[in-house]
Amino acid sequence: MSSRNSFHAEASKPTRRQIITGAALALGSFGLASTQAFAEAAQEISHAEEAIHQEPVFKASRKRVYEALTDARQFQKVTLLSAAVQSGMAKGNTPAEITAEAGGAFKLFNGFIVGRNLELIPNERIVQAWRVAYWPQGAWSLAKFVLVEQGSDTKLVFDHTGFPKGDAGHLLEGWNGNYWEPLAKFLA
């Protein structure tokens, strides 16, 4: 796996209104009231001045990468290879919970990461309202995964915005050690 990592201070970011409008459009007929986590995310997406941009490349098709990120059984196998589980920080025996539909919730790493899928375009794009358990109540961020075919490989163009200021370094380590590196091992 090769990658390009960065985090940017003062990155351009969507306004709260743009995020809420985009999320509402992405959910279409899925009603905001019926999705508590999404409703909280829409009301309180944080407005940080930092952003993470990464472009890991995986030796797998877009379909395999997409399925590994959206299928609970496959992502559980990725979780078992993660730095969090290997170090004992997270329990590997707690299954990943992922509802693979727009508006569906996910719960990963024993509830340390939770969120809601705002947009799922199979084999192309995943957009999530995403949060870490220790963030202040109502603090949500936006994670966007775009899958780009590169011959027989897949480049994952990843942007993470709206997280609490000061968390970029920790999150960057987490994306590498708990998502990209174990995902590359799983797909190998």
Report the location of each language-model feature:
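Beta-strand/loop substructures that line and gate deep hydrophobic ligand-binding cavities in soluble
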Residues: R131-G177
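N-terminal secretory signal peptides
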Residues: M1-P14
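A short, structured loop/turn motif at beta-sheet edges
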Residues: R62-K63, L118-E124, V146-K155
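Terminal, regulation- and interaction-focused segments at domain boundaries
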Residues: S46-R62
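Short, surface-exposed coil-to-beta transition loops
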Residues: A51-H53, G111-G115, G138-K144
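N-terminal twin-arginine translocation
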Residues: K13-Q18, S29-E44
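Hydrophobic pocket/interface hotspot
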Residues: V65-Y66, F75, F106, N117, ...
